[in-house]
Amino acid sequence: MNPLTRVALAVAAFAALVLALSACGPAHVAGHVPKRRDYAVPDAAGQEAQAASAGSTWREGRAASMLYTDARALRVNDLVVVRIEEIADAKRSADTDLTRRSELNASIEAFLTSLDAPYALKGGATTGFKGLGSTARTERLTATVPAVVRKVLPNGNLFIEGHRVVLVNAEEQHFYISGVVRPIDIDQENGVKSSMVADAEIEFTGRGVLSDNQRQGWLSRLLGWFWPF
């Protein structure tokens, strides 16, 4: 075997080793444990499942329209696509105007008759305060997150939970949603709007270089804690 072939084989073996190690490495920017919500029914009383009558495939209390619709997510581990579109717009303003005035006049002529009138004591004070403040905040979140049916509640509603991770240029974005939906609100494409999700928890977080640069450094936070102004 000539030296050139030997070097080529060594380089190929090293490249294969690097690829194998990278394939076994984590795909996340940092260690990550998916969130799992332990949802408990707020009040299970009066929500007991109704058994179907003998020889009947229809259960009393189920929405009548569900009998004629296409197959939808109704069981544990079925998929539901949640279309998140949350818009929050809040405004607040306050105006305060306060004025206070006091005067004091006192004469000592009755005690010191030799003093002229200009020696009478007079005093006055005026205080005022005026404050004006306003705040406005607008937020919008739009995303599509597939979710899984985790539980079927006694009344037929579904507890769903979904988690989606997107990694772009060493920046990791996490979408999470969980909540309760009615089967009747799920459309023919097994999708549901986030506005129809009850007890919803929606989270959008990021990790990576961009998210780290948006955080204030520890020294700046320490100086800000000590600085009184």
UniProtKB/Swiss-Prot annotation:
Signal peptide range in chain numbering: 1-23
PROSITE patterns assigned: PROKAR_LIPOPROTEIN
A Pfam family assignment: FlgH
Molecular function in Gene Ontology: cytoskeletal motor activity
S-diacylglycerol cysteine: lipidated positions: 24
Domain of life: Bacteria
Residue positions bearing lipid (N-palmitoyl cysteine): 24
Subcellular location: Cell outer membrane; Bacterial flagellum basal body
InterPro entries given in the database record: Flag_Lring (IPR000527)
Keywords recorded for this protein, A-Z: Bacterial flagellum, Cell outer membrane, Lipoprotein, Membrane, Palmitate, Signal
Homology family: Belongs to the FlgH family.
Subunit structure and binding partners: The basal body constitutes a major portion of the flagellar organelle and consists of four rings (L,P,S, and M) mounted on a central rod.
Record-given protein name: Flagellar L-ring protein
